[in-house]
Amino acid sequence: EPMGKSQWVYSDANGKLVYKATKRGDRIIDFSHAGYKGGGVTLPYVPAKLTVHPLGENEDCTDYIQKAIDMVSALPKDADGFRGAVLLAPGRYVCNRSLQIMTDGVVLRGSGSDPSGSVIVMTGDKHTAIVVNNGIRQRAGNRLGEAAPDEKSIKVTDKYIPAGSYRLTVADVSGLSVGDNIEIRKPVTEKWIKYMKMNDLVRDGKPQTWIKAGRQLIAERTIAGIEGNTIVLSVPLVDSYDAKFTDDNTTLVVANNVQRLRQCGVENLRIESPAQAVNHGKALYYALRIYGEDCWAKDINALETMESIGVGGRRITLQQINVIRRALHQGASKPAEFAPNGGQILIDRCSVEGDNIWFVALGAGQTGPIVFLNCSFKGNGRIEGHQRWSTGLLLDNCNLPGGGIDFKNRGSMGSGHGWGTAWSVAWNCLAKSYVNQIPPGTYNWVIGSKGESTPLRRPFNQSGPTLPVGVFDSHDTPVAPQSLYLAQLKERLGESALQAIGYGPTVQLPSPVRSDYTFQGGMQASRELAGKDYRAIHEYMRALGWDYSEHPNISKNDHYDGVHCEVLFDATLQQYVFKFTNHANARALDSDRGRLLSDRQRNEMKSQTNHDWYHLNGNWNEWQRLEWKFRIPKGFQPTTKFCHLHQLK
């Protein structure tokens, strides 16, 4: 079937995105600012300063690894703000306490997330495996809060600021400068609470409070420009600001003293917890917490942890983080395996497997944007804004065939969660069901997605009416562009931004069936890698969402015939290429799988470094084409019994 067309965002004849706006100017926001450094920037490779090897089989490694982290933390920063990485050699590391990064510019890197890589084995008392946090108690930047009495507030004078706007007007620009970090503070009033119909929440005969009047919804932004009394923001606002409901008291505050960790990362690790078949209130082991700015985590497999991944701050990327929960969670109150709280957060090519859990749940008052891109969820869990007015969530090409997506009013659930999310989008998703509701004065959109719409009443108010249904646009028919985030990123920063985050150039491919076939992932060799060790090639590939690894022969010995991937200039192709050398040695003749000293010669292309089916995603009626170019040198002689020139898995 041909791709559908959204009424709300579509490409015109020149390929430029066109946005439909409401009568008041609200529109789907530009989500492309989510991610490390504001989106479209390659996750950095930070050279290792120290390498750590496993201790004895059951010996605790916490202090051993932490000492290495502390030593690197004491090094001076380079021009890019990095001190260095601690590299964990392959092996199993028993840890009974958290590993903590508390200083800017430090990276903890393993040697792979599969069982033969670097494995953190959790034991001991309740703790999180890895924590990135400077230990300073601070505002998350995007939260419900109360104004400090000594802060200078500047009045915002607009009568209405639509969702998606980059601009606002203030009474006085003196003292403001381009580059200032600011907070836009929207007061919560009794008038607004009543308008949202959140003033009558009751549970078990007791009144419940949604958001207390006098609190503030706070959006953290940076000043990109000043035009008269108009402030141009670096990132659009993901909520509307109506002076009628704020008592004309929305304010702007300069917040240049936010003290967060910066330029920290966690990479290429496996975290293993004992099975936790308990209520999440009794959970012992959590995988990762990152509270910072311009930080990242990538290529991490977390097994049997609970409430696994928590993020706070802004401009953070999580890439290829996989959470696998096979021990069934007990109880009605469920853990959230991804809890992204803050702004400009990108969760890219991640996955969760488990039942009776929240795949994703946001905290209160988050003011985004928060993006889940090409993520997969296996089980009966759901994705929610969850509670107390979080805005600006994009689910882009997310696949949860057994679960659901909810943009809804939770009423008196929890302690009065009420309206959980607004101004949020599910774009070209697949889910079993959607609860898409529309809060007063706002929108939620489900566009180009497949799955059943399930209208509901407000919980604990079953005699009340079914709540208004949000926008379902081109339902059951995927729309172009295939990815909203990637299309917005390309329009804002160009093709190079897509390649920088591992999605490569988008070019038309011929097809006898489909005219709208596009290539969305690719990799070419970089001349900068010529002559470098294969580990540099490995990191380059992983930064683009690919992978390369050298494996010993089945006897588990190291390669005695050299490294088998390098980058060089090919005179025939007139470009830099990856050169793969197949094993061929009389000491290791080809044979059947598993024989001692056998060496199955191969170069493989896989959907992921593990074998879980859901890492290679596709939508109904979507064609997929995978191709690569290679040249076999003249005189190439494979051995006679077994040889893979290229293998696609």
Task: Please tell me what each predicted stretch does.
Residues 124-144, 148-149, 165, 244-256, ...:
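Extracellular beta-strand/beta-solenoid scaffold signature
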Residues 372-511:
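Gly/Ser/Thr/Ala-enriched C-terminal appendages of enzymes
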Residues 512-649:
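Low-complexity, Ser/Thr/Pro/Gly-rich disordered linker/stalk regions
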